[in-house]
């Protein structure tokens, strides 16, 4: 797909394909017994988890990690309980000034080992995907001190009323993300995806001022190194997404792929099956959703995926 060569069929992988929907994952985690923040530091175990979806016939393997992985070496440690909770929220300028830019070969070496291990196991049979959380998504977590889903309006207001704080935090996160993704590519990631998980909650003026510049810097830093996929969850600002330099756009289920294709015929599109249909729909509903999605792209420049990650309640079958 990214080499612009014909493929025999539309390739498919799923966000969060290695995780709690898989009984084998649940069994391994139960036997292991460690909290997630420790599991992510175990390269051998994380490699094993990453490879579980191979038996499903997916066309790519994404490494098993969390979008928050770079935060701990920055000085913003966290634990899973069961969702991630930071040791303390980052809400003061002196806290931002104390954040360090990690040195990936030293501070994130587990990720490098995972990617090397995946390539050693796969021997070129499947591409390996790396990823990172986008700076705004990471900033939301840091300011909230936990999952920000319930208080995004308050976070947006805080960031708008503290522009110097916001600029300094996003600058550190953008530098960290660029270094992190380039390190992943150096260690065997064939493609990388940037996850902005709350983009659908951000007003356009805020998005244009604070989100777009970091997306452009990060994705353009990847040029000629590896393809970059932008997942800006449910984001309606299509022209902004297209201007980032991304090689592919991962779209939510609320966006018509055919309309995107009309406007941007050469873009590689990833998506966009509603993850709730996969979790709650009948086999017929799932088949219909897949056919509709495939019909919209006619199988051209398309990676079949979901609107967001697999939901925990999704039946493994």
Residue spans of the language-model regions?
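Short, basic, glycine/proline-bearing loop/turn elements
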Residues: 27-39, 93-104, 241-242
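Active-site loop segments of alpha/beta catalytic cores
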Residues: 107-317
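Glycine-rich, proline-tolerant flexible connector loops at the mouths of alpha/beta enzymes
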Residues: 62-82, 86-104, 188-207, 307-309, ...
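Glycine-rich, aromatic-flanked loop segments that form ligand/cofactor-binding clefts
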Residues: 2-17, 58-86, 106-150
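N-terminal basic, low-complexity leaders that serve as flexible interaction/assembly modules and, when applicable
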Residues: 1-80, 216-217, 295, 316
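Surface-exposed, active-site-proximal loop segments in enzymatic domains
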Residues: 28, 76-80, 93-98, 143-149, ...
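Exposed alpha-helical structural elements
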Residues: 1, 23-27, 35, 95, ...
């Amino acid at each position: 797909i990214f080499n612009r060569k014909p493929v025999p069929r539309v390739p498919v992988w799923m966000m969060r394909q290695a995780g709690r929907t898989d009984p084998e994952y649940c069994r391994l985690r139960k036997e292991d017994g460690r909290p997630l923040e420790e599991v992510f530091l175990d390269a051998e175990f994380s490699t094993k988890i990453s490879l579980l979806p191979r038996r499903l016939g997916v066309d790519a393997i994404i490494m098993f990690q969390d979008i928050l992985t770079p935060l701990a070496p920055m000085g913003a440690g966290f634990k899973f309980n069961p969702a991630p909770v930071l040791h303390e929220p980052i809400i003061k300028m002196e806290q931002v000034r104390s954040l360090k830019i990690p040195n990936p070969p030293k501070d994130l070496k587990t990720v490098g080992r995972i990617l090397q291990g995946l390539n050693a196991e796969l021997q070129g049979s499947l591409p390996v995907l790396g990823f990172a959380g986008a700076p705004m998504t990471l900033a939301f977590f840091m300011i909230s001190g936990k999952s920000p889903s319930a208080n995004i309006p308050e976070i947006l207001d805080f960031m708008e009323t503290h522009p110097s704080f916001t600029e300094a935090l996003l600058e550190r996160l953008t530098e960290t993300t660029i270094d992190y993704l380039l390190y992943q590519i150096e260690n065997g990631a064939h493609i990388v995806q940037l996850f902005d998980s709350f983009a659908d909650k951000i007003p356009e003026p805020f998005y244009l001022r604070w989100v777009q510049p970091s997306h452009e810097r990060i994705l353009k830093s990847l040029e000629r190194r590896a393809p970059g996929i932008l997942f800006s969850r449910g984001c309606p600002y299509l022209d902004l997404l297209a201007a980032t330099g991304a090689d592919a756009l991962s779209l939510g289920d609320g966006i018509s792929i055919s309309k995107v294709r009309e406007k941007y015929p050469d873009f590689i599109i990833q998506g966009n099956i509603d993850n709730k249909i996969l979790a709650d729909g009948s086999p017929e509903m799932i088949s219909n959703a897949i056919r509709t999605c495939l019909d919209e792209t006619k199988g051209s420049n398309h990676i079949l995926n979901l609107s967001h990650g697999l939901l925990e309640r999704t039946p493994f079958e």
